[in-house]
A protein has these predicted regions:
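Generic non-transmembrane alpha-helical segments
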Residues: 98-106, 150, 189-193
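Active-site rim beta-loop-alpha module in soluble metabolic enzymes
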Residues: 85-134
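His/Asp/Glu-rich mid-to-C-terminal helical/loop segments that flank catalytic regions of hydrolases
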Residues: 168-194
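Glycine-rich phosphate/pyrophosphate-binding loops
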Residues: 49-53, 154-169
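Metabolite-binding pocket within alpha/beta catalytic cores that recognizes anionic/polar moieties
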Residues: 1-97
């Protein structure tokens, strides 16, 4: 807890040790924390949980979204100097498959697919999300792409499990209280992956 004032806590779940901590907001924050956890603290897998805005009509408030892949409008992967290319950031297949199975067994509405990790929260082009939706992105958040890139680069595992907090299609949204008190299904699924 003495590094960067981003507090982490370690306990046990069903007899297995598990650590939890915040990841900040956006790719720069999770990029720093995940890189250091993987490279300096021996962490082998990171499961990020968080909220997302739905781009797909089948994704309703409180549904889970397992980010099988993460697209981005960021230049995060430019650091890898891939000549003429972009990097497709994906989740660890084993973690994603197990998360899907756990969610189904628990009866939680769950969707699996691509999401958008965006650098932009308040977009000056309010309709741009439709282009990402047309390409099959289920939802938008701000961290998964950087986490998946760091995991791939360092030979580690990563997964993002999201809860739909609002919809770009219906304009429905959860309240701050609902986000604080009701987003527990993704936590339950994540804990079963330990």
């Amino acid at each position: 807890n003495g590094v960067r004032n981003m507090f982490g806590y370690t306990g046990t779940y069903k007899g297995k040790e598990v650590s939890v901590m915040g990841s900040g907001m956006g790719m720069p924050s999770i990029g720093i924390y995940s890189y250091e956890l993987y490279s300096q603290y021996g962490v082998e897998q990171i499961i990020r949980i968080g909220s997302a805005g739905a781009y797909a009509p089948q994704c309703n408030l409180f549904d889970l979204v397992i980010a099988q892949g993460a697209c981005t409008n960021s230049n995060w992967a430019s650091q890898y100097n891939i000549p003429g290319g972009t990097y497709s950031a994906i989740a660890d297949f084993e973690l994603a498959s197990k998360a899907y199975q756990v969610a189904k067994e628990k009866g939680y509405p769950v969707h699996v697919g691509n999401i958008l990790s965006s650098d932009i929260f308040y977009n000056d082009q309010p309709e741009v999300w439709k282009k990402w939706a047309q390409l099959g992105c289920l939802a938008v958040e701000m961290e998964s792409y950087a986490l998946y890139c760091n995991a791939a680069y360092l030979g580690k595992k990563a997964l993002c499990i999201l809860t739909v907090s609002d919809s770009f299609i219906t304009h429905q949204e959860t309240t701050a209280e609902e986000r604080q008190n009701s987003f527990t299904h993704m936590m339950e699924v994540a804990l079963e992956l330990i």
